Each structure stands twice: as structure tokens, then as C-alpha cells.
């Protein structure tokens, strides 16, 4: 059985911190979906298609990375893709507090899906998207 993971985000824009997490995560599972959130309420700088294209261009050589978009609950997306892992990057303590709350909600909705946290490299900790 393939081990499938999802790294979700808005990626507005894709930056060095995202790229670092993706490069580290891609070798851990058979397939890594980069799930770009369609978040019209966030007032993104770049369109959904532009954000997807940034990621596709950066990782065009990677055969086990798939770039998709989503506008529903992440946990539902994971179930539809048979993904058992959600990948999240952590930079600072406030990231952990938010992610801990999300982890609790996700575990309530689907206890079979695990969340794996990758710490940002020190040089990428100050970097944040929009």
C-alpha cells in the first residue's frame, strides 16, 4: 500500500520555508500532494492558478509530488486521496498552538489520519507568507 501524505497551505507566495519543508517531506512518503487552498476570504496576492504554477515550476522534476487545489475540509481531502499523513511546518511557538488545535479537530473527525510536524530550519524561521 502506498504511503500518501498531504502538505496543505495557501502558499501565497511559495517561499524558501515551504520549499525546505517540501524537499524534506518528499522522501518520507511514496506520494506527496501539495494541496493549495482556494481561500478567497484570505485576499491572496496571487490567484489559485498562479500559486499552483509556482509550486509546479519549482518541483517539475519530482515524480512523486502532485500539486492540487482544494476548497473543502482538509480531512475530507485526505480521505478522498487515501492519504494517512498531513504534513505541517512549524516555525515558532504560536504555530504550534494553532496546529495543536487543528490536530485535535482533525483527530476527532478522522482518527486514522496522522499529522507530522517538521520544524523549520533556523534560517527559515522568520519567513512567513501573506
Task: Give the residues covered by each predicted segment.
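Nucleotidyltransferase catalytic core that binds NTPs
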Residues: 1-130
